[in-house]
Amino acid sequence: MYKPLPDTITIKDSGIHGLGLFAKEEIPSGTVLGMIHFQFNGELMRTPLGAFGNHSDDPTCEKFWDSLENGAGWYLRTKRDIYEGEELTWTYTLYKVTI
């Protein structure tokens, strides 16, 4: 069954901007949270997980390209242990996907 967000994450008001992603419980470093972007018909599409993340110059997460069990795309992984209630952020960059 498709789930737009992992069970460990919720969407709440953010002090950074608008809404953000927050940990509902502690999340260990190196945890793959899910896909944030994928390519469809030549277009880069954003998932719900990718839609609510905020930028930080000191992010708690990092994005990486991979072809995991759910398909090829940009995925999100924690860079360090995340505490309950902490906002999940990553560094926004422009990127071109070539498959």
Task: Give short role names for the model-derived ranges.
Residues 1-99:
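Conserved catalytic SET/PR domain of SAM-dependent protein methyltransferases, capturing the structural core
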